[in-house]
Amino acid sequence: MADVDELEDPMEEMTSYTFARFLRSPETEAFVRNLDRPPQMPAMRFVYLYCLCKQIQEFSGETGFCDFVSSLVQENDSKDGPSLKSIYWGLQEATDEQRTVLCSYVESMTRGQSENLMWDILRNGIISSSKLLSTIKNGPTKVFEPAPISTNHYFGGPVAFGLRCEDTVKDIVCKLICGDASANRQFGFMISPTDGIFGVSLDLCVNVESQGDFILFTDRSCIYEIKCRFKYLFSKSEFDPIYPSYTALYKRPCKRSFIRFINSIARPTVEYVPDGRLPSEGDYLLTQDEAWNLKDVRKRKLGPGHDLVADSLAANRGVESMLYVMTDPSENAGRIGIKDRVPVNIFINPRHNYFYQVLLQYKIVGDYVRHSGGGKPGRDCSPRVNIVTAFFRKRSPLDPATCTLGSDLLLDASVEIPVAVLVTPVVLPDSVIRKTLSTAAGSWKAYADNTFDTAPWVPSGLFADDESTP
């Protein structure tokens, strides 16, 4: 079996043991040359994970993944453990249910996301949700060479703002919107069990269950992808141009006051797109409601080459988002709750990166539901998906020192004050999912073929019109 060379610092060595390095290792290349056909995904992904976990367990004590793989291997042909060949064929013959168990082990081992070393390593050779659109457009040029994850963000910048406010939005969704529904707020890296080339990490999912260290998704599970809008962060001051429009929204929550609030900045987050026209790629929320048509902007017609956009627009145009306007803690003894609810015709932009993020989350969570017993017979195994847009203001001297969400959930003193949350359901047509994944998988395959002498083949099920792969 492929071993990682021993160095003084095993953690440092582990961080360099990527999927690309595994494919280029002499032992892997020798094993592949002795096969009667090219190795296949996702089996090769799981062989790599076995080799990686074998090294990790020496100092982590986590043996679950390797033990489960060993139970799938028919023969132990070496006193030092099973060979790559035995491991590969055991995993090649594994069922989707067994592969989902392996993926659940990986998810449980990688919680903590950017703070987890293994989470960073596993991105190598994976088309993640944030890379799906760029892979379709430009090819997976960075998939096998992902940029290192940075955790050193300027406190006053948009990335740090989003990170520190995300937990507050999770609290609002779980406690105030969903009414304490069973939820999981901490996810590791979720690799697709059916292909081994796609992977996601979720922000929040409600209606999930726990089975030991594993998360069990069900046909009632609902994904929430959270976006905290830094460009709408404002001060409670008459000199802030956003504040007057927020005041109008707070005093009279309605569609008209919300339109004014959204359009209080130069590049608003909601774009008006009439039927039959092509949206821009500028931001991720659209509307066809004429009340939002405040500027005469010419837009191209939908035409040849826009079939997927047209199908996605048709599926989402009737979506109704729900705006939750929050109470002001300075008027409620520090308590933040839901002041009012306003339904609005706002839906996701299928040309924006966030659409592709939730598409891949929907696909992979659906895989887990189907292959882990989380779906009931006769029911659709697909999860529901929402994108959450959260708006905040800076703290004011008038705000109490202690603020709570609801009556008892403390709001961290370092976090800004939430003023509104917009929940937008997302509809993902099957035809769009199939074509998107087929294009991305074909791009991954072509890049791997040109990069590695031992490139594994991608499952043919990912190719809608191509049976050239086994």
Curated annotation (Swiss-Prot):
It comes from the Viruses. Gene3D superfamilies: Herpesvirus alkaline exonuclease, N-terminal domain (1.20.120.860). This is Shutoff alkaline exonuclease. Changing V458A: 80% loss of nuclease activity. Belongs to the herpesviridae alkaline nuclease family. Forms a complex with the DNA polymerase BALF5, the DNA polymerase processivity factor BMRF1, and the major DNA binding protein BALF2. Plays a role in processing non linear or branched viral DNA intermediates in order to promote the production of mature packaged unit-length linear progeny viral DNA molecules. Exhibits endonuclease and exonuclease activities and accepts both double-stranded and single-stranded DNA as substrate. Exonuclease digestion of DNA is in the 5'-> 3' direction and the products are 5'-monophosphate nucleosides. Additionally, forms a recombinase with the major DNA-binding protein, which displays strand exchange activity. HAMAP family: HSV_AN. Changing F452A: 98% loss of nuclease activity. It holds the Pfam family Viral_alk_exo. One of its GO terms (cellular component) is host cell nucleus.
